[in-house]
Amino acid sequence: MSGQNILKCKKCQLEITNKIITNHNSDTFHEQCFVCKLCSTPISDPYFTDKETGDFYCAKCEVIRNDQSKPLRESLGFCSLCYKYFRQNEDILTIDLERYHIGCLKCTICKKGINNEKYYREKMTSKLSNYCCEDCFEKVDKCNGCNSMTLGQTLLAMGKNYHANCFKCFKCSEIIKPNSPYSINKQTNTPSCQKCN
């Protein structure tokens, strides 16, 4: 026996001398030790692993577990980015009415996580925003109309960046839509819409 690797069961820590069961993590088990936590039947594919406890569940019992925890998951809500439900006692980052897993909210520029540190936000729609960490804020282009960052679609007019809603007529304050004609007041270097021209 010397020189051979002795395989031990991950659950009972005893040597495996007969049939070896290997799970997706390459852990080895006795056949009688690799069983469902709920019903104690030997596990075959497919099976599920609880990420928090490491316990294994057969497909039938996983369905039962999901049904039992559904009201709790729905009451906790879900992440505005990945749409996965929050777990009980999980840290959640809330910005306005949007809720995020801590690991989901990232800087649009450097992709580092944004936790509770200082950040900048550009609202794209009522449910979609771009975020920028403080380190990257100085690196991004700013809108010439509102002076906030431009992370999403921008309009280039008169050699400057604008949010689509910030490029406005200097006289009447109407938004000048992309590809619409406008003129530039040479004295003030400001745009005028076709009506005010």
Swiss-Prot record:
Annotated SMART domains: LIM (SM00132)
A GO molecular-function annotation: zinc ion binding
Matching InterPro entries: Znf_LIM
Keywords on record: LIM domain, Metal-binding, Phagocytosis, Repeat, Zinc
GO cellular component: phagocytic cup
Domain LIM zinc-binding: 7-68, 77-139, 141-197
GO BP of this protein: cortical actin cytoskeleton organization; filopodium assembly; phagocytosis; positive regulation of phagocytosis; response to imidacloprid
Superkingdom as given in the UniProt entry: Eukaryota
A UniProt-annotated Pfam family: LIM
Subunit note: Interacts with ChLim and rab21.
Task performed by this protein: Involved in the regulation of phagocytosis. May repress ChLim and activate rab21.
Name the record gives this protein: LIM domain-containing protein F
Organism: Dictyostelium discoideum
